[in-house]
């Protein structure tokens, strides 16, 4: 028996797999989930979800949301998600550099918040890419 993980965005099911273990980027830190985990509802932060399937870890970038764990079913509802195979490393590096530059230029509170969110997303994308190397 294993965990069934379903990642859902507002417009589609991004990922549905059976896994042995999952590590979620919760708002309070990394959260590991194994089979027969107690029922749980948790907020998710921008970050990399890692799923272990047959001794291979598969990363997926999550952009904030919620996860519900119940009866070996993990339902993840997020604003957006990206599979690593869809991320171009060169473009991700450029976006990270641009996000850092925008963070330094930000002056209003709104600009600072938006640039921080963009920076966190860019870092998560790079972290996911680097986890495969």
Swiss-Prot record:
This protein's record includes keyword Plastid: yes
Keyword match Mitochondrion: no
InterPro entries, per database record: ATP_synth_F1_dsu/esu, ATP_synth_F1_dsu/esu_N, ATPsynth_dsu/esu_N
CDD domains xrefs: F1-ATPase_delta (cd12152)
Role of this protein: Produces ATP from ADP in the presence of a proton gradient across the membrane.
PANTHER family: ATP SYNTHASE DELTA/EPSILON CHAIN, ATP SYNTHASE EPSILON CHAIN, CHLOROPLASTIC
Protein's recorded name: ATP synthase epsilon chain, chloroplastic
């Amino acid at each position: 028996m294993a965990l069934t993980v379903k990642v859902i965005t507002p417009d589609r099911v991004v990922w549905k797999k059976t896994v042995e273990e999952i590590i979620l980027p919760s708002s309070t830190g990394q959260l590991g989930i194994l089979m027969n985990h107690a029922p749980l509802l948790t907020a998710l932060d921008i970050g990399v979800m890692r799923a272990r399937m047959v001794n291979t870890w598969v990363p997926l970038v999550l952009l904030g949301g919620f996860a519900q764990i119940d009866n070996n079913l993990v339902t993840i509802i997020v604003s957006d998600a990206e599979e690593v195979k869809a991320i171009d490393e060169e473009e991700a590096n450029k976006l990270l550099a641009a996000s850092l530059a925008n963070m330094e230029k930000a002056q209003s509170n709104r600009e600072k918040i938006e640039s921080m969110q963009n920076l966190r997303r860019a870092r998560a994308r790079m972290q996911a890419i680097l986890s495969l190397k």
